[in-house]
Regions:
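Terminal amphipathic helices with adjacent charged low-complexity linkers/tails
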Residues: 188-211, 387-413
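A carboxyl-terminal module marker
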Residues: 2, 433-436, 514, 585, ...
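Mobile "lid/hinge" segments at catalytic clefts and subdomain interfaces of large enzymes
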Residues: 113-127, 134, 307-406, 562, ...
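Conserved mixed alpha/beta core segments that line enzyme active sites in large multi-domain catalysts
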Residues: 47-77, 250, 256-324
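Phosphate-backbone binding interfaces of nucleic-acid-interacting proteins
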Residues: 1-198, 335, 354, 358, ...
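Extended, well-folded interaction surfaces typified by the phenylalanyl-tRNA synthetase beta subunit core
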Residues: 407-411, 415-570, 712-715, 765-767, ...
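Short, hydrophobic beta-strand segments
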Residues: 3-8, 159-168, 218-226, 358-365, ...
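Glycine/proline-enriched, intrinsically flexible loops and inter-domain linkers
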Residues: 4-5, 63, 188, 193-288, ...
Length: 797
């Protein structure tokens, strides 16, 4: 937002220069992105009067003008502007003058001497977007008589500094001069007062009828002004608008824009003779079309709020007026509109039509719902000032006054929050400087919040206001106060996580961090249980709309990204949190720490000394078991073949810690891999919180046995569908302390075997830490193993 320094000074007694003011405003919480002096690099530019204009004798498009600049000698100036003419008051840059990027010298143009230049506004540095259309292709002409030789910089209001403010969405009140005046009053500890409208309220009755049929319109005022004269605005009004980044159009439109800047209240003027006596505010109907003021024909949607004459749309409410009721030079009677529209409705309409305006920008952020009457009175006052013969009818419409919110807070609450000591009187003074009403009862303050400040609703908001005005720089730098200190250190869980990261990085894994937000579809992929989703209310994109319930989708996307860039051998690890909703919006989602891995390609693929090996299920399983070995849980872990959505139906297993399901491991389903252009890819995922909580035991060290081990091999036939885990569990069920190791060393499937059978061979290791085992002792236990396997259904070979 562009703000005039000179305009601001009309509301407050500011002595600071523009740069110091900008610094103070920024420290108060409203960022000033820049300060520009409009007359920078402009000198020796004055007001002149064109006394004569003659055609250049040797150039068809040039004119030779005699210009009076209030000096004894008249200036001869050659000018090529198509709109220059005798009898005009113009801007003259004399010889020796400087303009942005130009220094004026005496010159000859096609043989005729020129003693200066008649200037356009663009040549003075004004942006073409704010120059009145009638002067865009030529020089600027003053509409009224001016003092000859007067400094054109002062006459045009260019002796002004423009502050470029970056207004955050919560501070819509600062999108107006009055709102900024309140802010400056608080920052400089000055009382801000505004002159009431001088317009008498004894207007004649009106025939205008206003009907509001949409909930998106809370307040709507219409007021008829007759017998106006549409013409160019006076210079003071034009310069106010141009300095604020708005192009002057005509006096009526300029007044509505001026009130927009002054009050922050968007307004609109309709040609009453094109509207009639009826205004109906409603939602658009299917098939309705409106040509807006920018000349675009827009097909309306049922969600659009429109202003109608009772039959057809005449404006897109809060966004832009319609071409069919535009104020023109022939307009004699107008209807002024001052309304409060729902911010969400305006934002939706603006986005749907790709149409933004100064009005919609303010409605979207939220304006003061009690400002409509004051704004329309100010507009009427200005119209009567510029059109003395105009007559005004009484305003009519729907007004729902909004009550001021109250927030109760205490002095101690503010001081405790900020870590400072302010008295109740000091806090009250700060809040009252913001034009808040404060009722004091001991140290308790009941603060009434003006309706222009919708951003303030809770105690913390008031704390922020106090420290903004008190000054962040006034906070003393102090060390925290501690009654006692405790030695810092990592928790068991933190140490375990750090240790696992180091181990996996040492094994060649890349530690990965992915977004916690995924698409709605991805949020429930690769989950073992059904949980409620945790969705954002207003996601930036649909691909990042829901909190993840598994780390696998993010890892697979990372694998896909890298494989597409020719990184085919990957081992990725991620330790991160997943989120499970409860189905109750009032209950926080449960956060659980997971560990996941993804592997694809080969190992040792670039090592000349070792043969490469393709990553398979057992490669992934070996890496997963590193976790359990590090945490001393390897004997408690078991695997169960299972089908999981998105995983290969024959190469996937659930992982159990005791009787508790903690995760899974397996190959990504070939269809999923094909969709992502991946080769065989294996993943594993476990609930790390569960694993760490089970491992919270101190490590126990045992002496390596001094006695020899005895091994016995067993070969057997089992069903093809039998899992090795089942065989392992049968042997473990013997529950003999002498069995210290069970290893699978051979697996065979072939036509020589019985139909539906496979051959497996195991080595069982027996040992005793206290003595050397005898053959009889080993045989006794081994026979129990054979019997258990026989009962299971295995055929011992």
């Amino acid at each position: 937002m562009l703000v005039s320094y000179n305009w601001l000074k009309q509301y407050t007694n500011i002595e600071d220069n523009a740069t110091d003011l900008a610094e103070k405003v920024t420290r108060g919480g409203i960022e000033v992105e820049g300060v520009e002096y409009l007359a920078d690099n402009i000198s020796n530019v004055v007001v002149g009067y064109v006394e004569t204009k003659e055609k250049h004798p040797d150039a068809e498009k040039l004119n030779v003008c005699t210009v009076n600049v209030g000096e004894e000698d008249k200036l001869q100036i050659v000018c090529g502007a198509p709109n220059v003419d005798a009898g005009q008051y113009v801007i003259v840059a004399k010889v020796g003058a400087t303009l942005p990027g130009i220094k004026i010298k005496k010159a000859k143009l096609r043989g005729v001497e020129s003693q200066g230049m008649i200037c356009s506004l663009k040549e003075l540095g004004l942006n073409q977007s704010v120059v009145p259309k009638k002067y865009q292709d030529g020089i600027y002409v003053f509409e009224s008589e001016q003092k000859l030789g007067a400094d054109a910089v002062e006459v045009l209001g260019l002796n002004d500094y423009i502050l470029d403010l970056s207004i955050t969405p919560n501070r819509a009140d600062a999108l107006s001069m009055r709102g900024l005046a309140y802010e400056l009053g608080a920052l400089y500890n000055q009382k801000v007062t505004f002159a009431d409208s001088e317009v008498e309220e004894n207007y004649s009755d009106t025939e205008l009828k206003v009907v509001v049929e949409s909930d998106s319109c809370k307040n709507y005022l219409g007021q008829v002004v007759k017998n106006i004269e549409v013409k160019d605005s006076p210079l003071w009004l034009q310069t106010r608008l141009m300095n604020s980044g708005i192009r002057p159009i005509n006096n009526i439109v300029d007044i509505t824009n001026f009130v927009l800047l002054e009050f922050g209240q968007p307004m609109h003027a309709f040609d009453k003779d094109l509207v009639g006596n009826s205004i109906v505010v409603r939602n658009a109907k299917e098939g309705e079309v409106l040509e807006t003021l920018d000349g675009e024909e827009r097909k309306l949607q049922e969600s659009d709020l429109v202003i109608t004459d009772g039959t057809k749309p005449i404006a897109l409410g809060g966004v832009m007026g319609g071409k069919n009721t535009e104020v023109s030079n022939n307009t004699k009677n107008i209807i002024l509109e001052s309304a409060y529209f729902n911010p969400v409705s305006i934002r939706r309409t603006s986005a749907a039509h790709g149409l933004r305006s100064d009005s919609s920008a303010r409605f979207e952020k939220g304006i003061d719902p009690n400002m409509q009457k004051a704004a329309i009175q100010r507009a009427v006052e200005l119209i009567l000032e510029l059109c003395p013969n105009a007559t005004v009818e009484a305003s009519v419409g729907v007004v729902n006054k909004e009550e001021e919110k109250e927030v109760v807070i205490s002095t101690s609450y503010i001081n405790n929050y900020l870590g400072i000591t302010l008295s109740t009187e000091e806090i009250t003074s700060i809040l009252e400087s913001l034009s808040f009403s404060v009722e004091v009862n001991g140290e308790e303050l009941t603060v009434k919040i003006p309706t222009r400040r919708p951003d303030i609703s809770i105690k913390q908001d008031l704390v922020e206001e106090v420290i903004r005005i008190y000054g962040y720089d006034n906070l003393a730098s102090t060390l925290p106060k501690f009654s006692k200190t405790t030695k810092g250190g990592l928790t068991y869980s933190q140490r375990a996580i750090r240790d696992l990261r180091k181990v996996y990085v040492g094994l060649g894994f890349n530690d990965t961090i992915n977004y916690s937000l995924v698409s709605d579809e991805e949020s429930t992929q690769y989950t073992l249980d059904n949980h409620h989703k945790v969705r954002l209310m207003m996601p930036m994109t649909e691909t990042h709309s829901t909190l993840r319930q598994s780390l696998i989708p993010g890892l697979l996307n990372t694998v896909q990204y890298n494989v597409a860039r020719k990184q085919k051998d990957l081992k990725l690890l991620e330790i991160g949190r997943v989120f499970f909703g409860s189905g109750d919006d009032n209950i926080q989602p449960k956060e659980t720490l997971y560990l996941s891995g993804a592997l694809t390609g080969e190992e040792n693929s670039t090592k000349w000394l070792n043969e490469s090996s393709v990553i398979d299920f057992y490669t992934a399983k070996g890496y997963l078991e590193v976790i359990f070995e590090r945490l001393g849980l390897d004997e408690k872990v078991s695997y169960k073949k299972e089908k999981i959505d998105g995983m290969h139906p024959g190469r996937t297993a659930e992982v159990y810690l005791g009787e508790k399901l903690i995760g899974f491991i397996g190959e990504i389903h070939p269809v999923v891999a094909s969709d992502k252009d991946l080769n065989e890819t294996y993943v594993f995922e476990i609930n790390l919180d569960e694993v760490i909580s089970e491992s919270k035991v101190k490590p126990r060290y045992e002496e390596v046995t001094k006695y020899p081990e005895i091994t016995r091999d067993i070969a057997m036939l089992v069903d093809l569908v039998d899992e090795y885990q089942n065989i392992y569990d049968v042997i473990e069920s013997i529950n003999s302390k002498l069995i210290t190791k069970i290893e699978l060393f051979d697996l065979y499937v072939g036509p020589e075997l019985l139909v539906g059978k496979k051959s497996i061979a195991l080595t069982i290791t027996y040992s005793d830490k206290q003595k050397t085992l005898t053959d009889e002792e080993v045989t006794k236990v081994h026979e129990k193993v054979l019997k258990a396997l026989d009962e299971y259904g295995a055929i011992i070979r």
